[in-house]
Regions:
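Residue patterns forming the tRNA-binding/recognition surfaces of aminoacyl-tRNA synthetases
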Residues: 1-17, 71-74, 87, 96, ...
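Protease-associated
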Residues: 17, 21, 28-105, 114
Length: 264
């Protein structure tokens, strides 16, 4: 049969070398459309919005089929770059995929997005790093290059390979460091967490029975509400500001490792 293309989208081309999956919404309707002899699949609600040329003029197209999002789940596709092995490069369902923006099909690079990472853990597809903690690529044609310097080049190279259907430029918000103004890169890395759920009741009890607050309304006000809503606490801080964790480790005169946690 004819080749069919899943029309996925991203605002972060630098994450594409780490792509290991695509996500659709199982409850959305998708259309298979024919444009200039090529077949593309995207959310039905977005067909007219997406099928425009680079001057935002409507393209001629033919709808050749309709699918439910769940019909796409389990399909495999050819990787953009390296083959990431077993269970990679498949389509999964995710309820956070919508028809508000993009194409209704989302590119997934698990180590560079919180929702992507959660889905990868749930469905057991690979999560791979292509960028080190300083923002430099560790593999491929861009090895040693800074992520922001090659962001546009990645998109252009894929366009030349015939993989990118369209490059568009939009203005959208992006997180920056409020201290130095540099762009932030979301990147997963091994960390230690404190199990807050496992000791939430004890923390609430200590807050009520042991700690004296000044002013007193903080006890059952802001602080208690913080405890009730707190997620697991990430202890592995990489920040160079704020208060350090008061944990002291060392070896005593007998050669035994000692650890002291300084209380307030």
């Amino acid at each position: 049969g004819e080749d069919r293309y899943l029309l996925a989208w991203t605002t972060t081309p630098w994450t594409l070398p780490a792509n290991t999956a695509l996500a659709v919404n199982g409850d959305l309707e998708y259309s298979e459309v024919k444009v200039d002899g090529e077949r593309y699949i995207l959310a039905s609600e977005l067909v007219e919005k997406v099928l425009q040329d680079e001057k935002h003029q409507p393209l001629k197209y033919e709808v050749v089929g309709k699918l439910n999002g769940n019909d796409l789940v389990g399909l495999s596709y050819e990787p953009l770059f390296m083959d990431r092995g077993e269970n990679a490069h498949k389509v999964w369902s995710a309820d956070y995929v919508s028809a508000e923006d993009g194409t209704g099909i989302v590119h997934l690079a698990p180590v560079y997005g919180e929702e992507d990472y959660a889905l990868a853990r749930e469905k057991n597809f690979p999560a791979v790093h292509t960028i080190d903690e300083n923002g430099f690529f560790t593999e491929g044609d861009w090895k040693g290059s800074n992520v922001w310097e090659v962001n546009k080049q990645i998109a252009k190279d894929l366009k030349e390979r015939g993989i990118v259907w369209k490059i568009d430029y939009i203005r959208h918000s992006y997180p920056h460091c409020h201290r130095c103004g540099t762009k932030l890169m979301y990147r997963a890395h091994p960390s230690w967490f404190m199990d807050i759920d496992g000791q939430r009741e004890e923390m609430l009890e200590q807050n009520t029975e042991v700690i004296n607050w000044f002013p007193s309304h903080v006890k059952h006000g802001r602080f208690e509400k913080n405890i009730l809503a707190a997620p697991d606490w990430n202890l592995s801080r990489d920040r160079f500001w704020a208060t350090a964790m008061p944990v002291w480790e060392g070896t005593d005169e007998n050669g035994e490792k000692q650890q002291i946690i300084v209380g307030s």
